[in-house]
């Protein structure tokens, strides 16, 4: 485990300067009323506050974002909260962090089951308030207004009434048979899904960037990447892929349509959107159809497209 962590950290250290270089010169979006807002960078996945990750990867990235955008970007740290101390919070705020988002406030995280999470939440509330931070859920209209001087925090978890309550068919939720997602749960057509990922410069456009620079249209991550941010600029990548019908289907939140130009009917996509979890229970979800289509068809198409783009720029 220690060797795997060191390998991932070294990979991130090598990749992040190029990733920062290939991000857009301006990160922002325009709302429906025509108002321009800062864009957001969410640092999440695993636990970004682990000492080695925080010191060797997270802090240099935060400092690089500050240098590139001069504060004109909203930086969000997502953490389970266990490692948020007075010292670490001060270090984050000093590096222009705008929101600390505490995930894992649910029964799936050890030590947070039921009322066990209440003391954890009380400690975090007190810590955040001591730094003048405002709980985002309490002042949602302020969050959407012009840039404010506030720093924010929120807490959430995979509870039944939450948007992630069904659990994505990924990771431990898949390995442990915890996902209850069905074909009615379209993760693509939602926040953190592929919806509007191609529409850069507009509200809701979002991509997922791995530590090695691989880019995906959603947080769940498709079975193959769109491209590599250590090798090309993000906007160039998205613009080059804009005409791909399968990606347009993801962009519109309609993944079952992604194979229609490749001989995959909606009916066939639904047939392939089924797999048996390690515990023997069959899961039926659109993400599984997406995995199958990427594996059989779209993965090689995207790989070829990336090679062509890189050859042209060589």
Question: In which residue ranges do the predicted regions lie?
Answer:
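Extended, compositionally biased low-complexity polar/Lys-Gly-rich tracts
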Residues: 38-45, 50, 206, 281-293
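Extended amphipathic secondary-structure runs
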Residues: 38-41, 63-69, 199, 205-212, ...
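Conserved, mostly hydrophobic/aromatic
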Residues: 77, 213, 234
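Conserved glycine-rich "GG(E/T)P / GGGxP" loop and the immediately following alpha-helix
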Residues: 1-159
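Flexible mid-to-C-terminal extensions adjoining Fe-S/redox cofactors in radical SAM and related proteins
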Residues: 220-314
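A C-terminal junction/extension of Radical SAM enzymes
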Residues: 126-221, 259-277
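Flexible loop/turn segments at secondary-structure boundaries
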Residues: 50, 85, 216, 224-225
């Amino acid at each position: 485990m220690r060797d795997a962590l060191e390998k991932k950290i070294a990979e991130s250290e090598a990749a992040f300067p190029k990733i920062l270089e290939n991000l857009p010169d301006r990160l922002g979006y325009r709302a429906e009323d025509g108002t321009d807002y800062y864009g957001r960078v969410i640092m999440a996945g695993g636990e970004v506050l682990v000492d080695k990750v925080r010191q060797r990867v997270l802090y240099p990235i935060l400092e690089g974002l500050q240098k590139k955008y001069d504060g004109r970007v909203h930086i969000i740290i997502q953490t389970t909260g266990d490692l948020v101390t007075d010292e670490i919070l001060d270090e984050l705020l000093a590096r222009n962090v705008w929101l600390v988002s505490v995930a894992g406030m649910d029964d799936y995280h050890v030590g947070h089951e039921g009322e066990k999470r209440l003391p954890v939440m009380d400690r975090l509330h007190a810590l955040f308030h001591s730094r003048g931070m405002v709980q985002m859920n309490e002042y949602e209209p302020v969050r959407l207004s012009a840039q404010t001087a506030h720093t924010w925090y929120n807490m959430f978890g995979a509870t039944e009434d939450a948007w992630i309550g069904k659990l994505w068919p990924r990771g431990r939720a898949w390995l442990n048979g915890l996902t209850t997602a069905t074909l009615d749960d379209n993760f693509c057509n939602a926040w953190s899904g592929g919806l509007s990922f191609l529409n850069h410069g507009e509200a809701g456009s979002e991509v997922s960037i791995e530590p090695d620079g691989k880019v995906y249209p959603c947080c769940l991550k498709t079975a193959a990447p769109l491209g590599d941010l250590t090798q090309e600029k993000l906007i160039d990548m998205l613009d080059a892929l804009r005409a791909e019908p399968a990606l347009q289907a993801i962009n519109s939140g309609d993944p079952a349509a992604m194979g229609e130009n490749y001989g995959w009917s909606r009916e066939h996509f639904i047939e392939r959107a089924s797999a048996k979890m390690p515990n023997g229970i069959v899961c039926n979800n659109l993400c599984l159809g997406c995995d199958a289509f990427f594996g059989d068809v779209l993965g090689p198409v995207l790989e070829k497209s990336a090679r062509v783009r890189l050859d042209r720029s060589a």
